[in-house]
């Protein structure tokens, strides 16, 4: 057994090892022209080294050999079945991993491992450095506006990356494999998919599990069960495969979708060739087809009924006393007709029934084969071998074909090639051979061809040199090189080989190697050490002695005896093959021994000529420094992380973009954004460890992170940062409550509606000005209370508008009582609503005392609207109403029954309160743009609208709005909290809308009410906006605009355009409402319900216990 002298002091500025029983870890550090290796106990961490440098000592890997987890047979062509990552995880083919993005500031990419391969520099060497990855796209990668960050889109695209870019494993499942989606999404690094995206044709496909496919031929199903896990079909047509088998009624064979028809009456399938006469094409869309039997029976039945109806009409013309006899006679005739019709149908089918006996045997055999196929069907995805699913575990199934054509390119979805674009100039040669863009099949088949060529060149020679490794399962031991062109490489050893033994061998070899003081990279060191280990058949002690014999004198290669290779030949080989010593051996093995080749190479490398030549090669490969988009230095092993040592030398202070923290153990590169303001060169806008964790793993900012995402942080600094964040949040809440209490005690606003009323701390007089009592002012001065305009209006805390959802302080109105934030353009309009008295500029009152601030100074004749990055203090309508009435309780929305916290409210015609977004997205409810106008139409909502159940909160009270696609219902406020899509449907009309003067007949009291009762508003003569909402996982239409999206041909958001153009519709709706009230209705009847609390008989909806809507909403106590 090989052992290392633990008392040897390793040349390092940080670590000295003297304890034999210390658990050790191998540390690899790279400088410009050298690599240093040292051992360190796990409890000691370097200041400039992170966990990503650590190669932990692992025990013998006992691989699981049961089905679905791992199989040792059949082995891959190169025998490499797994790889040990620096964090100790073992990755295998068909595992899902997180991969570093080649672009700094982007989140981790998610991929499936297909195979371990070699790049061109590693061909003919003993090292592997690459991995082939099958990509799974996030919605943001393919420009899909989906809020579910755990949703992925599968693909059949692959690339070859360096193995060092793989960070760790993750979990990816199909949606059908997940029983409880919410519980699954609460787990760390867990994702799911149910669709596939092809980037060459920019098209989405359905992904259906093979275990659920029924509607396919038996031989096709058997082949699918053996070789694939998923089926890729056209989007929206995957459900056809889940139905029962569609076999032809005539020939009993499976019917292809485009070569068969279905009877509209009996629902049976027929081949178009089996029908007599044969059908040349299918019926057009919107038309049905019936078979001959059903068509003839329907025609006979129709003619018989026409005759009987004529007889019945003649009988009704007789006297009244003969009506009963005519009725009995018609009934008897109908009974006789049914008997005759049944006899006719039996005679017609008599010829076909003769062949039933001959077909029963074939039908029974078909059912038995189908039954046996279902029994052999795998019950779950874990029963399938992982290696048999390589390289692809899914394939494309063209439902328009007969599913019998099998080619190698048929498994890819983009088989159809696109002709050359007519916009490109063409020549005579192009006309003979038109250019066609590459499809997925072309790219992947070309990649397969290149991999096969490298395998054919490299694998036979590798096993010829080292025959003892043949037919053995090998594992790759990852060794980070920290070079831009070769980030990491793998040493191949059997899976039962001890990692600790390999660590000891590499460390002792490095101590021997560094005494030569050669400016070589770690790639040469790995090539020599693994060659010596293979020469001694994996004996580390013997390999160490052989390496010593190759370097006699420990740094004096001139003591070599025997033949020497010419320096000119070595120089030419280095220029041709670089530092690949294995290529040297292949070229010179017939002339020189292995020892003589290494002696000659080391002597040439130590000579001045060799040093100069080799230094140029190493400088060209190692002098490149990784940087981000702003030129700041990043780590060589992870371009998404900043190098702290180099950042400190620049004397710049990093600050987190989202949480504004300045303390973090690691700093990550922030995603690039468009900078409108000049950049502060003394600061580095980055992401702290907590924000970087959420962004890199899930691809969204920290503000949208769920508690489960924060609980899944594995790093100790992240957990500590989370506790500090929670403490800071609690402190901010306490400060906010104290500020609200102070503001309520000394409100600084006008009340024009209340003439005189006395409260505890202040008095309202006829001049609509609040006179604060002296004791309140004195207490405020003693406690050094800040003005209300100096609190919570910092630039670091930008507010989010409750109406359009845009974050920013430009033109923002903040209610100083409830904290509701709205933009001035989203709520206050210049055309109407004299709201200058409601606005008090925060900067205008910053230098006033408490007494002076009681009288808001508004310049007469000028509007005090907000400027850029200026926040205005303001009181919303709900808070002003509570102050006028002397109430302290929150108002509740009549549509969702939730309080008015951080959401703008308006009054209704009936005297209730309603959220502005609830009323806007509820159909048949009119929302006026003017603040003083009430909301109309809630009392006219039908009772069934109050009975729908919300998909988010699970309650059935209030009014829910349904999605136009899936029909999912939810309260508008619940949908906003659950990250549903609230937006508008942008509609272009072919005809001009109605006008008030010319088309008065379009009003409701003239008969047509569809265009008036809806929420659609016209933004110009030909376009309109209609509020709609969609679920988080639904496919959005192309004409859908979010609330904060810019409307085409305008510079305003969709919400501001919508609320601005609602005003002209007010007169039409009020006229309609007035006429509808005056219009006579059905005669009044006795009211059956009476409220048990207020004895009221008027309510749009009655709740259990005979409670009216007003009492249920806590409007009457």
UniProtKB/Swiss-Prot annotation:
Q: Which domain of life is it from?
A: Eukaryota
Q: What is its main location?
A: nucleus
Query: Which residue spans match zinc fingers labelled Phorbol-ester/DAG-type?
Result: 227-282
Per the UniProt entry, what is one GO biological process? histone catabolic process
Task: Note the Gene3D superfamilies from the entry.
Answer: 2.30.30.490, Zinc/RING finger domain, C3HC4 (zinc finger) (3.30.40.10)
Q: Which Pfam families match?
A: BAH, PHD, zf-HC5HC2H_2
Q: Where is the BAH domain?
A: 89-208
Q: Where are the zinc fingers (PHD-type)?
A: 245-297, 798-882, 948-1002
Q: Where are the zinc fingers (C2HC pre-PHD-type)?
A: 890-925
Q: Give the protein's recorded name.
A: Lid2 complex component snt2
Q: Where in the cell is it found?
A: Nucleus
Q: Which GO terms describe its molecular function?
A: chromatin binding; ubiquitin-protein transferase activity; zinc ion binding
Key words of the record: Metal-binding, Nucleus, Repeat, Zinc, Zinc-finger
Q: How does it assemble?
A: Component of the Lid2 complex composed of ash2, jmj3, lid2, sdc1 and snt2.
What's in the GO CC field? Answer: chromatin; Lid2 complex; mitotic spindle; nucleus; protein-containing complex
> Where is the stretch described as Disordered?
361-380
